[in-house]
From Swiss-Prot:
Matching PANTHER family: ZN(II)2CYS6 TRANSCRIPTION FACTOR (EUROFUNG), ZN(II)2CYS6 TRANSCRIPTION FACTOR (EUROFUNG)-RELATED
Region annotation Disordered: where it falls in the sequence: 51-88, 662-683, 715-761, 829-868
Protein name: Transcription factor pynR
Natural source organism: Aspergillus niger (strain ATCC MYA-4892 / CBS 513.88 / FGSC A1513)
Source taxon at top rank: Eukaryota
Keyword tRNA processing: no
Keyword Transcription: yes
Compositionally biased tracts (Low complexity): 663-683, 715-727
Chief location bin: nucleus
GO cellular component entries: nucleus
GO MF: DNA binding; DNA-binding transcription factor activity, RNA polymerase II-specific; zinc ion binding
Protein's cellular compartments: Nucleus
Portion annotated as DNA-binding: 11-37
GO terms classed as biological process: positive regulation of metabolic process; secondary metabolic process
Length: 868
């Protein structure tokens, strides 16, 4: 057994100059000269042993630098030693290297006449999805107009979409999509993108030279080392994935003139785009793409994965969804292989730079890239309704990214080498990838638990095959969707308790708490067992457990709000930060709560009068909780999410409906005169006098009655709750029945009773869905169930499993990159702090009233520049 190599006792600098080395982490000689102190591994002494097998392998790997230009014919798949003729112009020099591999992948996924069958399970499913999409494209109208998306905006969308799509698979509530109304982001962009080729003609090599047609031989010749360094600073400060590249190692390679020029070109192109110099950025990008033909197809290293991932990220935000999918898929294939190798043989124990193990830094970059790829794969497969469990290597899901600077060897190396200028944005990138990994783990496990859709066997079928089909069907049935939702929610509640204890000691993560609370509310209302998007309220049963869990969720959300507000305000300068994501998850939870209250009202209609009397006190507790949640919109923090108007509108509509039910019960004399309000304790953890440091108004304002006239004390409803709510102007938001559907409104007429009539609901876009009577007068759940949002057709199911060892290892995991949309970062709710908020008289909740003032005479807080 070969002895493991050890680090030298003297650093490289002292050894080359033959001076005494102190042997410290940073020796005295290097510290006095302010240079890096590098300790290499000891070289084995004596004559090396000759291994015939190793020698043979070395001779094979030491072949020609590039693949031989053999044109691929008759649908023969390309490999590392072949090339392929471009589909754009057959007269162009045949493509080689990575460029040829990407061309093959594009034809397999999107070619009208595929040159070969898909080479792996991932591409087979992508190709199948694209064929189904193309078949339905002709019958569908245009979805979201094409446009561009900012880099941080797409990262924020990725995290929100993962949470929304997986809850849509299980829950019956629906949600306001973060992306906006219409198709989901991935499907919408795939419908728009009809690109026929993987590469533009300008990127292809010309027949006479190896340079791209119309391109420069070496575009980087215009950049000296100082200019390159400055552009790298810009890139590190602005790219949300800056944590996948080590700044210290890259600058070290740049000084030694060994840096990969293609990677530099891609990063410089992004830097020019950040500086609004698109012309130079596009030229650099074309040159970088053209150089892919010089990278051998079998060179599956970290640098190649970084190049293709960054190219895919650029293309998805520019609207080239097909090309982005191929770039990211190729990067995912390399990254998964590197991560698997890393799991078997760690890279640690190699060269040390200022005391930091270089192998550990490279391993961390691989793990960061792997989680980005896995997130993109899970995100796209959920929207494609394709099974995913067999593509997830179980052992790779056990290592989560670092969260803080002390835990990150990459950032520790930057500190040790005094590369400090971009540490803050790099830390933000690190925390974003950390959060993305947690969202991905939750979504992947829940999606894998989704019951399989049992299809009928094809006819005719031999009796032997029919028997096997029936037996396999029994094997796959597993647990019901209701049981899966219940078990999953119990697991989430256990995690929530742990996080809340950590938060009490200042170590909790409010963003994850907001995510788990949002998902747990959705899991309270499982979808129909058949998997069809039919409202399940006709069979849903009210229970004491349901009310208790909803009340507990309200308490948790109220207690979490100060932390969410503080983190969102602290991280407002970083648009893709965990603070911004936490705010969006919190809005998702509030949206789910408002829909849950409406769901309870829908079920309430069909229960007997005896049951209604039993649950009245619980319903009053939900009313108090809903009003308390509505009060939170007084604070500026929630107004950074573009969905705040719609969520607020749904909350007050739900509270108005509950109030009408309770008022009607009182008028009919069916309500008990008990003075108990509910078993809910709403003594939440918001300070009675918010401090200016929290960004919350410090004036104590009396609260006007919300939506309804003051009830007598016999009702058991508190007449006032400490709050300060700004009024909002009347604006049409997303309607309740179908997110994004804008319905006509009409002026609200005078009330003739305490029941909310259809005219009362006109301001909330609900009038067309409510009969001329009040909400509580509906005799069956069908009328009110029309208010609830429905989802798109039934998704494909997956095998049930929860524990990681049940994931099947796969050798090739290819991630996918989504297409873009017309929205910008501001449209995603990043930094949306503008537009004045007019007052609304909350006593009747009719929008358009005159501005109100606080109890102490101070003018209520307004937001400027808020766009709808």
């Amino acid at each position: 057994m070969a002895k493991k190599a050890e680090l030298r006792r003297s650093c490289t600098f002292c050894r080359t100059r033959k001076i005494a080395c102190s042997g410290e982490r940073i020796c005295n000689a290097c510290r006095s000269r302010s240079i890096e102190c590098v300790y290499d591994l000891e070289i084995a002494k004596g004559r090396p042993r000759l291994n015939k097998t190793t020698s043979t392998r070395a001779s094979i790997s030491a072949g020609p630098a590039g693949p031989s230009p053999i044109t691929l014919e008759d649908g023969e798949p390309g490999d590392g030693g072949h090339s392929i003729t471009s589909a754009v112009n057959p007269s162009i020099t045949p493509l080689t290297g990575v460029m040829a591999e990407l061309e093959v992948m594009f034809r397999e996924n999107f070619g009208e006449d595929p040159m070969a069958a898909p080479s792996n399970q991932f591409q087979d499913r992508v190709a199948r999805f694209n064929r189904n999409l193309a078949a339905g494209r002709a019958s569908q109208g245009p979805s979201t107009p094409a446009g561009s998306l900012t880099y941080p905006g797409f990262l924020a969308l990725l995290m929100q979409d993962l949470a929304e799509t997986v809850t849509g698979k299980f829950g019956d509530l629906g949600c306001h999509p973060f992306f906006g109304p219409g198709e989901r982001f991935y499907r919408a962009c795939m419908l728009q993108d009809t690109t026929k080729t993987m590469f533009d003609t300008a990127c292809l090599p010309s027949p006479s030279t190896s340079t791209p047609s119309g391109g420069e031989a070496d575009i980087l010749a215009d950049y000296n080392s100082h200019l390159i360094t400055q552009h790298l600073e810009v890139w590190m400060s602005n790219h949300p994935l800056s944590i996948i590249i080590s700044k210290s190692l890259l600058l070290r390679d740049l000084r030694s003139q060994t840096a990969n020029r293609v990677l530099l070109a891609v990063m410089l192109a992004d830097a020019h785009h950040f500086a609004d110099n698109s012309a130079k950025g596009d030229r650099l990008l074309q040159w970088a793409v053209s150089q892919l033909s010089n990278i051998p197809a079998g060179q599956e290293d970290l640098t190649t994965a970084q190049i293709t991932l960054l190219l895919g990220w650029f293309h998805v935000c520019r609207g080239h969804s097909r090309r982005a999918l191929c770039y990211v898929g190729y990067a995912g294939r390399i990254t998964t292989k590197l991560a698997s190798q890393l799991h078997e043989s760690p890279l640690t124990g190699q060269t040390h730079i200022n005391g930091i193990d270089r192998g550990a830094v490279e391993a961390e970059m691989i793990h960061h890239m792997y989680w980005v790829m896995l997130a993109l794969t899970v995100w796209s497969f959920i929207q494609m309704d394709m099974p995913l469990a067999d593509l997830l290597p179980a052992q790779l899901l056990q290592v989560l990214p670092a969260r803080t600077t002390p835990d990150s060897t990459l950032l520790q190396l930057d500190r040790a080498t005094d590369n400090l200028s971009t540490l803050k944005p790099q830390l933000s990138s690190l925390q974003s990838v950390w959060l993305l990994s947690h969202v991905t783990v939750l979504s992947a496990h829940l999606y894998a638990l989704y019951p399989q859709h049992l299809r009928s066997p094809p006819e005719p079928q031999p009796w032997q095959d029919l028997m096997l089909h029936r037996l396999n069907r029994l094997l796959r049935q597993g647990r019901s969707l209701t049981q899966i939702c219940s078990d999953s929610r119990n697991a989430l509640l256990d995690i929530i308790v742990v996080l809340q204890k950590e938060s009490a000691h200042g170590r909790g993560e409010p963003t994850l708490l907001a995510l788990y609370l949002a998902v747990s509310i959705h899991l309270l209302f499982p979808r129909d067992e058949t998997g069809h998007h039919v409202h399940n309220s006709q069979t849903f049963v009210l229970s004491d457990t349901l009310f208790q869990q909803l009340i507990a969720s309200i308490q948790d959300l109220k207690q979490l709000f100060p932390a969410i507000s503080s983190v969102a305000r602290h991280d407002s300068s970083q648009p893709a930060s965990t603070g911004s994501a936490g705010l969006h998850f919190y809005l998702l939870a509030l949206d789910a709560l408002g829909r849950a209250l409406m769901y309870v009202l829908t079920v309430w209609d069909r229960v007997t009068a005896v049951e209604q009397r039993v649950w009245q006190d619980r319903l009053r507790g939900l009313l108090d909780g809903g009003l308390a949640m509505h009060d939170l919109f007084e604070y500026d923090a929630l107004l950074q999410d573009h969905r705040w108007r719609s969520v607020k509108k749904h909350l007050k509509t739900a509270c108005k409906g509950i109030k009408g039910v309770l008022s009607g019960s009182r008028d009919q004399g069916s309500r008990s005169s008990s003075s108990s309000v509910s078993s809910l304790d709403l003594s939440f953890a918001l300070p009675s006098r918010p401090t200016p440091a929290m960004g919350i108004p410090t004036s104590e304002e009396g609260r006007s009655e919300m939506m309804f006239p003051t009830m007598p004390s016999a009702s058991g409803i508190p007449s006032s709750i400490s709050s300060s709510i700004s009024h909002t102007s009347r604006e049409v938001g997303l309607s309740w029945p179908g997110d994004g559907q804008i319905l006509p409104t009409q002026e609200q007429g005078p009330r003739e009773s305490s029941h909310p009539a259809a005219s009362d609901l006109s301001d909330f876009d609900l009038a067309p869905f409510v009969s001329l009577g009040s909400i509580d007068s509906m005799q069956n759940g069908d009328e009110r169930s029309r208010i609830m949002q429905q989802f798109s057709p039934n998704p494909m199911s997956l095998p049930s499993f929860w524990h990681d060892p049940q994931f099947s290892p796969a050798h090739h995991l290819v991630g996918t990159m989504p297409p873009p949309s017309l929205i910008s970062l501001a449209d995603l709710g990043m930094g949306e702090r503008g537009q004045k908020r007019s007052s609304e008289k909350l006593g009747g909740l009719s929008e358009g009233d005159t501005p109100g003032t606080s109890a102490d005479g101070g003018t209520k807080r307004r937001m400027k520049g808020m766009s709808n």
